[in-house]
UniProtKB/Swiss-Prot annotation:
Acidic residues compositional bias, start-end: 488-500
One GO CC term on file: host cell nucleus
Keyword Ribonucleoprotein applies: no
Localization: Host nucleus
Pfam families: DUF587, Herpes_UL87
Family statement drawn from the similarity comment of this UniProt entry: Belongs to the herpesviridae UL87 family.
Gene that produces this protein: UL87
Superkingdom to which the source organism belongs: Viruses
Low complexity composition-biased segments: 910-929
Region (Disordered): 482-508, 910-941
Lineage of the species this protein comes from: Viruses, Duplodnaviria, Heunggongvirae, Peploviricota, Herviviricetes
Protein's name according to its UniProt entry: Protein UL87
Length: 941
């Protein structure tokens, strides 16, 4: 049959045109010529004709759909994309272009519909067939633009984009004489339908039936959102109107049907809000139970209250602040409290119709005003129903509740629920909510409110549906546009990587989808190779809870390890009441210290410190300040331990990291003293030898042996500071980095997720230096590769539980306080000294600078001299070679004075004109002769 609609047979549907009948064609007709809108003159009359009731012919509707389906461009090949293009034309809606035809062409065009109307605006004068000599000259027409003339015909069709009509045959010739070329640069055009295939209002739901055979409702919604964003705000109202027509919202049901549908729709929305609440217990179920019960009792008032706009100020006559704070906490709503000034909002009718131009979503009680977020208007209205409309629910509902007059609802109704005799909807944890109407209490109450006329109810129903349907789509698209304008193109590409494609257009308007898909494929293939890179790790809890934050600049990489973080969060006390008082009270164990300055109790354990700020306003909410080191799961574990000691009912996540301290080591530096000697705009602390550099309003402290601490920041802010510090180090004049060692130690840190202890680092340093001494500098690359492969295979792995040189509370809790006190020390000059007194990150040159030659055996001094000589031969800067030469000169001179180890100092490799700052000697290593006792032998090692 000619014009048959596409049907699903297997996977793809085909349009089969049977017989010898020619398929009716859709032609391209301009709607803007020389900045003149040709559709404006007939818009009122055509809208009236379009809305006029008319019997629907299903076969004609299928023929219209088939004609539009065939009118798709050639590059749109798949069935869903072709149906989306048909949907796009239907969303833009019908248009009409007036024209005046002379006797030569009258009656010859199958697309010209006869009419008689005087047009003051522009219209097309179709005067003859084009005689330009082109291929289509015998078919196409020519036109000119007229004004103040009578229109004899009308061209009707659907508004389309010009890019959709590129391959459609044009009704007018494209030559300059024909006039068709003048409208090709406009954005919009018309897909002109034959005269017997014109559309009417009642045809749209039947066209949606044809679309629904290919596309789902969610795909249609996504496409509508994409088209609205692509065409802009000017075309959005037109798209929304035709979108509603596709779903038959123009069909006005009878009054009882409309009321029942509206009630069911509100019940469905309230149930969706209830299922979206995270906590299902007595507080949340009592709130929604009262709202639903009031909806069944007084449906009209509650529905009007739930539709209050954000500009309307809601006044309450009954309010309980402690209960409200607890409800807001469990619903996770952001509210702010203030004073309600007189004159900002005048109270009236059902909730105060006065407006405050400066504030929105206000809920006022006496002098107190509560401001909700811009997206929480529905929640504001729910609280208005709960406290104002449902305050006397106990006298009319299914269970008796104490009625409060003036000062709020009694605390006895805090845990009340609806009667189990009602038809209920059960939540996941057993709490039930009513979803059916309550029985009518009395005839007087039933007839207390006058009924509206049927037409007003139907109109109200359509308004409610339209508001609830399109508010979410518009809000989602505005957020997407705002995020795209703020973050730019890079974040959009990252969104494509992560799979969040809700806001991306599902249809290729510009023809760039294939190229973007290819670029995304290449990017994913590149990232698949780097799946084990630190930047690709998935962090539980986000970057704020990352134990390791790594950045790299050129070939320099730095890993910052979190030492401790301070986390703020809220918690609610459990329902365990004090004996005989009926009031919740915190259970304070003996290990919690009380602060006499404020309402604070401190809970200290080796793993964490929790400061509890107790509320004194009977809200039963505690503010927690947690000081801990560890990952997000360890933080949750510490909260569980804290919950065993204190009667906490719920912790409210997500937690906020307000302070985070990190520590980092710069590996591979040949001379670690350069970092603190070649920095400008710094200052030194007086009580401790620490250099402070100010970066992004954060004071970064640099200690000896290229170790730094970064306070207060974490996540992206920490990465920005690390990049700036690396940039300063990279631009220093005398900085030389051994990238072989740098790569090995960076890999060790990432492999063990902990900073390298002093002994583990010295083992790798001296082992590599001895290998260089044995095999020479020519084998340096092979030796560096060998050491790196050994580190990758775990030969130099270490345990963070053995790094007791830093008294970390979390580490002490894991290994025990007795083992944590066994700090590795050495015996120097009959005194115990920590192994890392020179710095945990000290390298060979830093260690040898502090060695006194006359205090160590001759054989070990010889090894040190040979190691320094090997390092001097591979050094990359004259400054480092000069420092090594001075160290060798000091060691050999001191040894020659006693044992004659070096007959003469080694030759100077570079000029000694530049002065090197001397580093004060702190502690020397003992052992002038080979020790005999076991304790002395351990100390010498």
């Amino acid at each position: 049959m000619a014009g048959a609609a596409p049907r699903r047979l297997g996977c793809d549907a085909l349009i089969v045109v049977g017989g010898s009948a020619m398929p009716r064609r859709v032609l391209h007709v301009p709607v803007h010529v020389r900045a003149c809108n040709l559709t404006q003159e007939l818009s009122t009359g055509e809208d009236a004709r379009f809305c006029r009731p008319r019997p629907v012919n299903v076969e004609r509707v299928r023929a219209v759909f088939a004609a539009l389906y065939r009118a798709c461009p050639i590059h749109v090949r798949t069935e869903p994309e072709r149906v989306k293009l048909v949907l796009g034309r239907l969303l833009l809606g019908p248009v009409a272009v007036p024209c005046f035809c002379d006797g030569e062409v009258e009656g010859h065009g199958e697309h010209l519909v006869p009419t008689t109307q005087f047009c003051r605006g522009p219209l097309l004068y179709v005067h003859r067939r084009c005689c330009c000599g082109s291929v289509t000259a015998g078919r196409a027409l020519s036109y000119h633009v007229l004004e103040n003339h009578v229109a004899t015909h009308v061209l009707r069709g659907l508004l389309s984009l010009t890019e959709w009509n590129r391959e459609l045959p044009s009704l007018f010739c494209d030559c300059p004489g024909g006039g068709g070329a003048s409208g090709t640069e406009e954005r919009y055009a018309m897909a002109c339908l034959p005269r017997d295939l014109s559309l009417h209002l009642d045809d749209y739901p039947y066209l949606m039936v044809e679309i629904g055979r290919v596309l789902s409702v969610s795909e249609v919604d996504d496409y509508v959102t994409a088209v609205s964003g692509y065409l802009g705000e000017a075309a959005a109202p037109r798209i929304q109107v035709h979108y509603k027509l596709l779903f038959g919202l123009n069909v006005r049901p009878q009054a009882p049907c409309a009321l029942d549908a509206t009630r069911d729709f509100f019940l469905l929305e309230l149930q969706k809000l209830w299922l979206g609440v995270e906590y299902h217990h007595e507080v949340t179920s009592e709130f929604f139970g009262r709202v639903l019960a009031q909806l069944h009792r007084d449906r009209a008032r509650v529905m009007m209250a739930l539709r209050l706009p954000e500009q309307t100020v809601c006044h309450l006559s009954t309010f309980v602040l402690s209960r409200f704070k607890r409800q807001v906490l469990y619903f996770k709503l952001q509210v702010s409290y203030g004073k309600c000034r007189t004159g900002h909002a005048d109270r009236s009718g059902g909730g105060g119709n006065g407006g405050n131009q400066g504030h929105h979503n206000l809920l006022c009680y006496r002098r107190l005003s509560v401001t909700f977020a811009d997206t929480d208007t529905v929640w504001r209205n729910l609280f208005y129903v709960y406290y104002e409309l449902a305050r006397d629910l106990g006298s009319h509902g299914t269970e008796d509740r104490p009625v409060s007059r003036g000062y709020g609802v009694s605390c006895a109704s805090r845990t009340s629920r609806l009667s189990p005799s009602e038809s209920t909807v059960v939540s996941a944890n057993g709490h039930a909510l009513s979803s059916t109407a309550l029985p009518t209490t009395s005839a007087g109450h039933k007839l207390s409110l006058p009924r509206d006329p049927a037409a007003d109810r139907v109109r109200r129903y359509v308004c409610i549906i339209s508001r609830l349907m399109y508010a979410r789509y518009g809000e989602r698209w505005r957020k997407h546009c705002q995020r795209r304008s703020e973050t730019g193109e890079e974040e959009e590409e990252e969104t494509l990587e992560s799979g969040e494609t809700d806001a991306t257009p599902p249809f290729d308007f510009t023809g760039q989808q294939l190229r973007r898909a290819y670029q995304e494929h290449r990017r994913r293939k590149h990232l698949a190779v780097q799946r084990y890179a630190p930047c690709r790790r998935k962090l539980i809890g986000g970057m704020e809870f990352a134990e390791v934050t790594g950045v790299s600049l050129d070939r320099i990489a730095v890993n910052a390890f979190n030492t401790n973080r301070v986390i703020n969060m809220k918690a609610a006390l459990s329902s365990i009441a004090a004996s005989g008082l009926g009031v919740r009270a915190p259970r304070l164990p003996k290990n919690m210290t009380h602060s006499f300055v404020m309402y604070k109790h401190t809970f200290k354990e080796p793993a964490c410190t929790v400061s509890t700020f107790v509320s004194n306003d009977a809200v039963y909410i505690n503010s927690l300040n947690v000081n801990i080191r560890g990952s997000y799961p360890e933080f949750l574990y510490s909260l569980g331990v804290y919950r065993l000691h204190v009667n906490i009912d719920h912790f409210f996540l997500p937690a906020v990291v307000c302070n985070s301290n990190s520590s980092l080591d710069v590996h591979g530096l040949e001379d670690q003293a350069v970092i603190r000697s070649e920095r400008s705009k710094v200052y030194w602390t007086t009580n401790f030898p620490c250099m402070i550099s100010h970066t992004n309003n954060v004071n970064v402290g640099w200690f000896k042996a290229a170790t730094a601490i970064v306070p207060r920041v974490s996540g992206a802010d920490l990465e920005a500071i690390l990049l700036k510090e690396l940039s300063c180090i990279k631009n220093m004049r005398d900085v030389c980095i051994d990238y072989g060692l740098h790569r090995v130690f960076t890999q060790l840190e990432l492999r063990n997720s902990y900073q390298i202890p002093f002994l583990a680092k010295q083992l790798v340093l001296f082992l590599r230096a001895c290998l260089l001494k044995l095999h020479g500098r020519e084998k340096r690359l092979q030796l560096d590769r060998l050491v790196f492969e050994a580190a990758q295979r775990g030969l130099f792995d270490y345990s963070k539980n053995l790094t007791a040189h830093t008294k970390i509370k979390h580490t002490c809790a894991l290994i025990g306080s007795r083992l944590a006190n066994n700090v590795p020390k050495i015996l120097a000059r009959n005194k115990k000294v920590k192994l890392d007194h020179l710095g945990r990150n000290a390298n060979v040159l830093t260690v040898c600078r502090h060695v006194e030659a006359h205090k160590i055996p001759r054989t070990r001094l010889k090894v040190l001299v040979e190691v320094l000589g090997a390092l001097q031969s591979i050094s990359g800067t004259p400054h480092t070679r000069e420092v090594i030469h001075q160290t060798l000169f000091r060691l050999c001179s001191a040894a020659a004075a006693t044992s004659g180890l070096c007959s003469s100092p080694p030759p100077l490799c570079v000029s000694s004109s530049s002065s090197v700052p001397s580093v004060p000697t702190s502690v020397s290593v003992d052992g002038s002769s080979e020790p005999t006792s076991p304790r002395a032998r351990f100390a010498s090692r």
